[in-house]
Amino acid sequence: MNTSRFISLFFHGSLVKRIIVGLVLGVVTALISPDLEPVLGFNLAEKVGILGSLFVKGLRAVAPILIFVLVIAAIANKKVGSKSNMKDIVMLYIIGTFGASIVAVLASFSFPMYIPLTTVADSLTPPNSVSEVFVVVISNIFANPIEALATSNFIGILAWAIALGIALRHAAQATKNAVNDLAEAVSKIVHLVISLAPFGIFGLVAATLADKGLGALWDYAHLLLVLLGSMLFMALVVNPFIVYWKIRRNPYPLVWKCISVSGLTAFFTRSSAANIPVNIDLAEELGLDEETYSVSIPLGATINMAGAAITVTVLTLAAVQTLGIPVSIPTAILLSVVSAVCACGASGVAGGSLLLIPLACSLFGISGDVAAQVIAVGFVIGVLQDSTETALNSSTDVLFTAAVCMAEERKNNA
């Protein structure tokens, strides 16, 4: 196989398969490095750790501009004047996201986690109360936009993005198209960075195992079990309860239909945006109101973020527990909901929720360097985490739309 063909295969093949290869090679490198050290004169696993460091730096670089342009584009291009039960559907989106945050917090406190971090800052300044968190949030909102982008002040970035998005809703269509083109360009850069994930995972796993030993794998396995368990609980317990509250009959036939059609496809595409056509077809098959689902499903792909709420909450609280920062459950729920809401606009990007972790971490006084390591941990487990998160997010879009439409139909027939 020539070099160009190898490069094409590696960069255009399945990302999941490539990450698995990087993960396996990282483990193998860590295992054989001690035996090779007398021959090479250095520990190979420690040296390849530079690949992981560069990957983390790339993630930190793209995260601020990614959130900025995607949120502007999402708000500026939002359709105006459509009713069609949207208030009820958006309310379910909000309830679902908040419920996911609660599930994630309870799971994190019930099964405390430790994740291996290479460096831990000594100058942590965790908030002492909810009121202090509000002070931090409000002060960060009024930051200079350029400074916010340069310093990764995600709250300030979000505030300016929302304000600009609202202002641009009344701009000329050509301006909105330009904003969309910019968002698409940034997304392509993000995909380029994420395409390097196998190299980054290879370096991160090798260096982590060389430093922490094989026991670090259990830390990742524990974290993954908490994440997936929370998402499954949300999909199979909380969501059916919400649907039953709306339609007043057995919700599981509808839940299974949405999971088997929408969730299964989204699991492999790992993109809520890419799964929109599947959800549209399913909504049509279910006989839902076209005026409603044609708006609610694309909107849900942007703002319905139950899976992201779980991911950001669990990983952030894992970092909090690792660093020994005391935090009450109400404060954890508040901060987790804030971070989940900030995920708006990033759901169409594979791994997008991971890039929001620095926002939640910053509210606990955790430094950007440590937050970037938490993102890297997320990519290590992302083969299943991101796929399951997307499956939950996307299947819930059509599930809640169907629930509201069926409830309206039941009301009209009563």
UniProtKB/Swiss-Prot annotation:
Alphabetic keyword roster:
Amino-acid transport, Cell inner membrane, Cell membrane, Membrane, Symport, Transmembrane, Transmembrane helix, Transport
Name the residues that span the membrane: 19-39, 55-75, 89-109, 148-168, 189-209, 223-243, 297-317, 323-343, 363-383
- GO BP term, pick one: threonine transport
Its subcellular locations are: Cell inner membrane
What's the protein's topology in the membrane? Multi-pass membrane protein
Out of the domains of life, which is the source? Bacteria
Q: What is its main location?
A: membrane
Q: Care to name a GO molecular-function term for this sequence?
A: neutral L-amino acid:sodium symporter activity
What's an example GO cellular component term for this entry?
A: plasma membrane
Pfam families, per this entry?
SDF
Catalytic function, reaction form? L-serine(in) + Na(+)(in) = L-serine(out) + Na(+)(out); L-threonine(in) + Na(+)(in) = L-threonine(out) + Na(+)(out)
Q: Which InterPro entries match?
A: Na-dicarboxylate_symporter, Na:dicarbo_symporter_sf, Ser_Thr_transp_SstT
Record bears the keyword Lipid biosynthesis: no
Cross-referenced HAMAP family: Ser_Thr_transp_SstT
Q: According to its UniProt entry, what is the function of this protein?
A: Involved in the import of serine and threonine into the cell, with the concomitant import of sodium (symport system).
Protein family: Belongs to the dicarboxylate/amino acid:cation symporter (DAACS) (TC 2.A.23) family.
Q: What is this protein called?
A: Serine/threonine transporter SstT
Origin organism is: Actinobacillus succinogenes (strain ATCC 55618 / DSM 22257 / CCUG 43843 / 130Z)
Q: What is the lineage of its organism?
A: Bacteria, Pseudomonadati, Pseudomonadota, Gammaproteobacteria, Pasteurellales
The UniProt gene name for this protein comes to sstT
